[in-house]
Amino acid sequence: MTSPVRILGIDPGLRRTGWGLITAQGTKLTYGDCGVVTSDGELPLALRLRELFEGIGRIVEAVRPDEVAVEETFVNKDAQATLKLGHARAMALLVPALAGLPVFEYAPNLIKKTVAGSGHAEKVQIQAMVRFLLPKAEFRVADAADALAIAITHASHRDAHALRQAHLPGGKRRSLTGQAAAGQGLAGKGFSAAAAARIEAALAKQG
């Protein structure tokens, strides 16, 4: 039997950074907790980033994950918004890296593909599938649901990174960038094999 792995998903945002904790053991996923870290929009950028840094640090210390997954930056036409998101994402990457945790990154379309079966899935579809895969999940904002989706994605693709783990001198694990490609889905369904296995397992339990 495979050992359980605690995975912290982080959905970066300057105003709200979502986080979600799950435990993965084989194809079984268990909900842990979720929430958001916020920054005061009235403060200067440097102080807002400090709020995110300290807030994410408290979460990492409290939930003690084994691995961390972060959503990659989505570049849009609003350069200023993209830049602000980049600042927030830097905090999401830096905090767990300083804690010696392995950090992986996933593209938004891969997260949607893994969780909902389509790289163009809407937020409501993502939230519905998160609730389906994690029946005990409780979230009030989309940021927390997105963070859980990121954690689920890493649970589905983490084996692809197993041989790429490296260590820094002194025994600290190095933060890695996971540019995982989507696995082959079921014919005509678009789900990855791991995601399909979880859905089938959930259906079997309900049946």
From Swiss-Prot:
CDD domains recorded: RuvC (cd16962)
Keyword ATP-binding applies: no
Pfam families, per the entry: RuvC
GO cellular component, one term: cytoplasm
Chain ranges passing through the membrane: none
Top-rank EC class of the record's enzyme: hydrolase
Active site: residue positions: 11, 71, 143
GO molecular function: crossover junction DNA endonuclease activity; DNA binding; magnesium ion binding
Catalytic activity: Endonucleolytic cleavage at a junction such as a reciprocal single-stranded crossover between two homologous DNA duplexes (Holliday junction)
Keyword field contains DNA-binding: yes
Essential cofactor(s): Mg(2+)
PROSITE patterns: RUVC
Cofactor remark: Binds 2 Mg(2+) ion per subunit.
Cellular localization per UniProt: Cytoplasm
Binding residues for Mg(2+) 1: 11, 143
Binding-site list for Mg(2+) 2: 71
EC nos: 3.1.21.10
Any single biological process term in GO: DNA repair
Function, in words: The RuvA-RuvB-RuvC complex processes Holliday junction (HJ) DNA during genetic recombination and DNA repair. Endonuclease that resolves HJ intermediates. Cleaves cruciform DNA by making single-stranded nicks across the HJ at symmetrical positions within the homologous arms, yielding a 5'-phosphate and a 3'-hydroxyl group; requires a central core of homology in the junction. The consensus cleavage sequence is 5'-(A/T)TT(C/G)-3'. Cleavage occurs on the 3'-side of the TT dinucleotide at the point of strand exchange.
Subunit structure: Homodimer which binds Holliday junction (HJ) DNA. The HJ becomes 2-fold symmetrical on binding to RuvC with unstacked arms; it has a different conformation from HJ DNA in complex with RuvA. In the full resolvosome a probable DNA-RuvA(4)-RuvB(12)-RuvC(2) complex forms which resolves the HJ.
PANTHER family hit by this protein: CROSSOVER JUNCTION ENDODEOXYRIBONUCLEASE RUVC (PTHR30194:SF3)
Name this protein carries in UniProt: Crossover junction endodeoxyribonuclease RuvC
Species per Swiss-Prot/TrEMBL record: Methylobacterium radiotolerans (strain ATCC 27329 / DSM 1819 / JCM 2831 / NBRC 15690 / NCIMB 10815 / 0-1)
Lineage: Bacteria, Pseudomonadati, Pseudomonadota, Alphaproteobacteria, Hyphomicrobiales
